[in-house]
Amino acid sequence: MTTPVNEVPEPSYPAAERRRRSDSDSSPTVDGNAYVHDESQPHDGAYAGAQYGSHLQVDTTFQDFDKTSRSPSAAREQAMRLEDDLAVLEAERVASRSTHGTEKDARSGDVHSLTRSRSRRAEDVDEFDEATNPLHEKAAVYNPPENPSTGVSKFIKRVHESSFIVRYFTYIVPLVLILLIPLLVGALAYPDASVGGVELLWFSVWLEIVWLTLWAGRIVAKLLPTPVNIFASIFTNNSKKWRDVAKQLELPVTLFLWWLGVEISFLPTMKNHHVDGNSRTRDWENTLNKIIISVFVWTILNLIEKFLLQLIAMSFHRRTYSDRIEINKFQIGSLTKLYAFSRNKIAETDEAFEEKQDKSGSGAKTPLRYAGKARGLALGALNKVGDVAGAVAADFTGRKANSSSHPSQVVIALLRTTAGCQTLARRLYRTFVREGFDTVFPGDLKEAFDDNEEAEAAFSMFDKDMNGDISMEELEAVCVEIGRERKAITASLKDLDSVVSRLGNVFEFFVAVIAIIVFLTLISTSAAGVLTSAGSSILALSWLFSATAQEFLQSVVFVFVKHPFDVGDRVTIYGNSGEAGLGDDYYVKQISLLYTEFKKMQGHIVQAPNSYLNTLFVLNQRRSGALAEAVPVVIKYGTTLEQMDALRQRLLEFVRSERREFQTNILTELRAVTENFSVTLNVVFFYKSNWQNEGLRLQRRNKFICMLMVALQEIGIEGPRMNLQGASVDIPYHIAGFPPPYQARDGPPVNDDGGQHPPHTPSSGDDQHHQPGHSPSYRRPSILRKGMVAANARARGVSISSRKHVDFSLGMRDVASNDIMGDVFEARSPAADSAVRQVIAERRIQEEEAERQSVESSRQRNSGSRTNLTVPTSTNEARHSIDSQGASSLSSISRNRFFRHRSHSHSTRQEDLMEQGRSSEQGSSSAAAIRPISPSYHPDEKKL
């Protein structure tokens, strides 16, 4: 290493006279670790060095002023970079594992494999996509066991998971063959045999009709969505909705068509094939026909009830959640594009670093490096093959498949937790913030989107305060809000589906009652009198059911008609709730048909009946816009209007400097004058958001209240008790008939006439209470700014936030984005149970893979005696081997991203020690042995 010709001299620190630092207003302030230069003082000459020698004097001739200091946001992002990258890699691993698991099942030809079914669902369906379906989906009637133990159960499970053609053929043929036995007996062996006066042959034919009509109706109902879609496309723009309705009504339509066919075929088949040739209807035929009619009426009412239930679910979904779902999907799509751009950009940086490191390699490392590259290429090729196979399987199943490296899977995985949302936000901030700036501007996002309009829409999504830039804290808050909104929509729609299910159960009960009444009316003529007497008895007991019926109707109206809140909303319930009985604030945790669960700010869970909530006023914070708050300040009587105006101007200056938090407007209102003793002044300030996020509200309110306190202290506005006797700081007692004390001054008293004239003594009537402009109390220096430094900073346009000594949010700035109090979703999902199930599932998969590999290895050893070539027996084994071999290369790339400066810092430290002459010969030799010798290095060029 050569020493440069022109060395930069070390900074010189001239000796200064030590003196105590003055607390006067002329001394500059220190904000954090930054020295605020006072431009009001001289800076050059010996006099300056002698007079102001208490300040550190540094020669800044060779200082690089273009390099800006790191902002707190950038410093926090740099400190969290390692954890963020590890979290992103974990999310990518989870997304890739779930995707490749589905693809492996698709490539093996068995989507519902037994191995996968034991661990998790065959398809990892996103809860958000599953919940945002506007229809009310009925659960499957039969769910096969996950681990069938007998051969019959395994056969039934395979049949149930096969195609509908195989299933229908398997279900239809056995019973058809059984019913064919009496048909053949009546046709061939006993032609004169009869059942109830009907020929055995035709009675068996009718039984075949009953069985085959069921499956014919099933097939017609399954094919019904296609013509419904075509017909609806002629009259509406949303034909998919009606097609999905037809899919959900498949079972009710099947039952309706089945019993329609049974009713149509029963009497003609029976009456026209009597043994005696008489076509008169028999008694049992009339009775059975009435039963069939009753069941047919039930199927009609059931079809109408299911159709109305779907209409209720769709209309409620469209009216309440459609806009929120569309906005959240756009937000997640924008985050996906931003993350994809970020990943590509960081990958390019890593590849450039890897290429730079490759230049120094030689010898035996070169083949290993190329082998690692080959493994990486093979791994990428297999990933592409898996993606193609997944796309083919998706084409057959009609589902949309994403590749294993699709950014949307990673973004969704990160949005599931608050920490993941913050990690994603810091990752995006790291990518898009420009060097030397603390915020992201609209032009920084244009590279990640296709057009400027989409980029502007995405920027407005993050720029909640509409000030033209995005800070890292704001980005974190928006990402947490997007993830929280996604979980809120999912939870709300799940609760809605549960409510619709319970409402459907109630409707089914009424349908069954109506069907029973119809059956009793048809089966007997005397049933009318029985029903009349039963109705009278029910009316006599109406007092017993009236309260329940009223509560049910009020709950239905509250949930489906009014619906004042959703899951996750912060609401204020007015009424007899709360500790004081005047109402309280809650977060909605769960909505049911008859009750709603709330979470208090303290964490308590409260349950309230919907019938009671139906009669109360409900304030919804999430549905509210930007809010204002009035802070009452009680000041002493006699405070001048100039002081009040100065207070308003000082607060206006504050809110204009904090545009990210507040609107630039302050209102003042004199509410009351109390007995010429005190004045109540209302100070109204405006937030830029609502109070849904309690942490953010506390942060902003603390900032404003602290600033209000400081402004009152600086201006000299005092409380009403300063008008009381003995309230002065200088003379804390009252003497009757003695003149009031002189006003305290910041500087020494000045007497221009040499002390010949005594100071002015006010008359007896000129009391301090009549001089509101003066304050007898001692004004302490502000914690915010001091004297000329504030004036100079204000003249330069420096924001107030840059001159703070303390955190005005009182610690709420760091927890505002978490919104711990408003998180009602962690308790809904049993995290411990899901984690245990996931670990058990992974353990099963590992055990099965190990067992399969042991079987394959033993098979290879047995075949090794016949051949010397060992070929992997399956694609999965080859894939597993390449995965295990490529893990080291992937981990090295990740390790290079985290620890790329370690060796460089070590060599730099050795070089610094050598230049300072503090390194020993051994250290120098070791450092020289470690550092590579550049081609341009010559020992003779070193200058001592």
From Swiss-Prot:
Domain of life: Eukaryota
PROSITE patterns, alphabetized: EF_HAND_1, EF_HAND_2
Catalytic activity: Ca(2+)(in) = Ca(2+)(out)
A Pfam match: MS_channel_2nd
Compositionally biased intervals (Low complexity): 916-936
Transmembrane segments: 169-189, 195-215, 249-269, 291-311, 503-523, 527-547
Membrane topology classification: Multi-pass membrane protein
GO biological process, one term: intracellular calcium ion homeostasis
Compositionally skewed regions (Polar residues) per UniProt: 855-876
Location, primary (coarse class): endoplasmic reticulum
E.C. no: 7.-.-.-
Enzyme class name: translocase
Residues on Cytoplasmic side: 1-168, 216-248, 312-502, 548-944
Subcellular location: Endoplasmic reticulum membrane
One cellular-component annotation, GO: perinuclear endoplasmic reticulum
Keywords: Calcium, Calcium channel, Calcium transport, Endoplasmic reticulum, Ion channel, Ion transport, Membrane, Translocase, Transmembrane, Transmembrane helix, Transport
Compositionally biased residues, Basic and acidic residues: 94-110
Binding site for Ca(2+): D463, D465, N467, D469, E474
Membrane topology, Lumenal segments: 190-194, 270-290, 524-526
Domain EF-hand: 450-485
Gene Ontology molecular function, alphabetical: calcium channel activity; calcium ion binding; stretch-activated, monoatomic cation-selective, calcium channel activity
InterPro entries in the cross-refs: EF-hand-dom_pair (IPR011992), EF_Hand_1_Ca_BS (IPR018247), EF_hand_dom (IPR002048), LSM_dom_sf (IPR010920), MscS-like_plants/fungi (IPR016688), MscS_beta-dom_sf (IPR023408), MscS_channel_2nd (IPR006685)
Family from the record: Belongs to the MscS (TC 1.A.23) family.
Annotated function: Acts as a mechanosensitive calcium channel in response to membrane stretch. Regulates intracellular calcium levels and cell volume for survival in response to hypo-osmotic shock. Involved in maintaining vacuole integrity and protecting the nuclear envelope upon hypo-osmotic shock.
Note on domains (UniProt): EF-hand domain is involved in the detection of calcium concentration.
Entry protein name: Mechanosensitive ion channel protein A
Organism listed in the record: Emericella nidulans (strain FGSC A4 / ATCC 38163 / CBS 112.46 / NRRL 194 / M139) (Aspergillus nidulans)
